[in-house]
Amino acid sequence: MAQSKPAYKVADIKLADFGRKEIILAENEMPGLMAMRSKYGPSQPLKGARIAGCLHMTIQTAVLIETLTALGAEVQWSSCNIFSTQDHAAAAIAQTGVPVYAWKGETDEEYEWCIEQTIVFKDGQPLNMILDDGGDLTNLVHAKYPQYLAGIRGLSEETTTGVHNLAKMLAKGDLKVPAINVNDSVTKSKFDNLYGIRESLPDGIKRATDVMLAGKVAVVAGYGDVGKGSAASLKAFGSRVIVTEIDPINALQAAMEGYEVTTLEEAAPKANIIVTTTGCKDIVTGKHFELLPNDAIVCNVGHFDCEIDVKWLNTNATKKDTIKPQVDRYTLKNGRHVILLAEGRLVNLGCATGHPSFVMSNSFTNQVLAQVELWTKFGTPQEYKLGLYVLPKTLDEEVAYLHLAQLGVKLTKLSDEQASYLGVPVAGPYKPDHYRY
């Protein structure tokens, strides 16, 4: 593979200059990652690491990649979604010599090919670290390249869906490398998942359709962190939001925020917009499509494309019109139309540019710290054994701290007496691990 593969494969390398300009802008909005370069760059803690990354190849990810290389790592990259690559970002990184295999609009076969190119490096040596988003790279290495598992020091996983995958693998005895669950760092799940989607969801819907959100009935399937951000965003735009949930605790939270909570079967006949956020499959199926009013918009912000039954639409619709890339209008047998965005994949990345740089700096700083933890602790008494871990609270607080100055935040300082009264160190950590923010 190492001898025959191309040095990179992107849509158009001539987009690199445009990509570089946007990367420079993003760096100004990503103080956590820039602080990682300043703090760790001189000591090169990732020297010797060969990181295979599978995560949306965006401008923000470009800043992450260049932070990893600044810390000494060799990196190869693919995207974790066929529509999420920003081609100018991929070109800019490829131009620096980092092997990137990603372009917007990959086929499923091309998608797997791209991931496979990141397994073995140009010198013939295989990966020894994994940075994943959703679990596709992790699953591929375990299933198809088990001979490399013994040499992998660890992996870090970005998203809820990927963490669920790791937990299942661990329970079955299938996970063979230690893993850090980046998603459940407070500075990831309570920021990226909540505040990130709050801005990127309406961006995706509006770029795709130019729809007026005010006054529309919007159904949000799922009220986890992503669902909470989605519902809050749509409500802020003036939509009348209905939530569907399986969990009584989340359902009660939604009700206490003033949302109507009911089943999708009851909500569908009046739903102008449906957003799935569950991480589960078969959320919007044929029976729901047939209940929708004319020209209802259906989209997803869960990681995979199994939440919306796109296959049913392609099989049962009498006509499919592609309005523009990632915007398809289906004519149903009942004469009504359904507008599907991003083919049921992530609408905020398929139809827009994903979360803003600042909130992604939170998430990606956690990724850098996770990679440093796994790589540098290997072979020491603090080595991460086989298992699924979260980053220590001290690092979670550090990530938050690195982003305060840019927002003009001034922290109150505990006195020694106050710290003693609370039973916490003056410099933190301030909350127990079980605290729910």
Swiss-Prot record:
GO cellular component, one term: cytosol
Pathways involved: Amino-acid biosynthesis; L-homocysteine biosynthesis; L-homocysteine from S-adenosyl-L-homocysteine: step 1/1
UniProt EC number: 3.13.2.1
Leading EC class: hydrolase
Pfam family, one: AdoHcyase_NAD
SMART domains: AdoHcyase (SM00996), AdoHcyase_NAD (SM00997)
Domain of life: Eukaryota
Protein residues bound to NAD(+): 159-161, 193, 224-229, 245, 301-303, 348
Reaction equation(s) it catalyzes: S-adenosyl-L-homocysteine + H2O = L-homocysteine + adenosine
Keyword terms, alphabetized: Hydrolase, NAD, One-carbon metabolism
InterPro entries (UniProt xref): Adenosylhomocyst_ase-like_sf, Adenosylhomocysteinase-like, Ado_hCys_hydrolase_NAD-bd, NAD(P)-bd_dom_sf, S-Ado-L-homoCys_hydrolase_CS
GO BP: one-carbon metabolic process; S-adenosylhomocysteine catabolic process; S-adenosylmethionine cycle
Binding partners and assembly: Homotetramer.
Protein role: Adenosylhomocysteine is a competitive inhibitor of S-adenosyl-L-methionine-dependent methyl transferase reactions; therefore adenosylhomocysteinase may play a key role in the control of methylations via regulation of the intracellular concentration of adenosylhomocysteine.
Name recorded for this polypeptide: Adenosylhomocysteinase
Originating organism: Caenorhabditis elegans
